[in-house]
Swiss-Prot record:
GO terms for biological process: trans-translation. Keywords: Cytoplasm, RNA-binding. It comes from the Bacteria. This is SsrA-binding protein. GO terms for cellular component: cytosol. The keyword Cytoplasm applies. Signal peptide: none annotated. The keyword Kinase does not apply. Gene3D superfamilies: 2.40.280.10. Its main location: cytoplasm. Disulfide bonds: none annotated. Belongs to the SmpB family.
Amino acid sequence: MVKKNSKSAKNASATIARNKRATFEYRIEDKIEAGLQLMGWEVKSIRMGKVNLSDCYVYIKEGEAFMHGCTIQPLNTASTHVVCDPIRTKKLLLKRSEIDKLAGLIERQGYTLIPLSMYWRKGAWVKVEIGLGKGKKDHDKREDTKEREWKIEKARVMKKDKVGA
């Protein structure tokens, strides 16, 4: 009987959702890990992968951090006596010192907090990776697109040279 490496299987499926547009829209300078305050039906939906982080952002209000716009679709088998709001604002679990530091950066230096990914920590805890960044201008986005296309073209040429040699 062959044993499978259980650690690699857990790490491979640890990422629940990823915000792919965040790195295109924002220049990320720092990353922070935060916990989420969730309801039971939300955890079940997250286990099934029904999460969307694309139009999501984080704001700080009265010394607490909240994630707004994260869509968690309820399952069809969700309880009927609980009202399931798919776009409910979720509280982020951060230390007071972290919140104060982030609030200062947002207010004084014009930074934005964007959820980058959602993943499982130690199998049972849902964590969110938050990026601290500034929005890119249109010309910055065009430069990034040109660089990405050049890398693809360069790899294509290198591959063609290796096959021909």
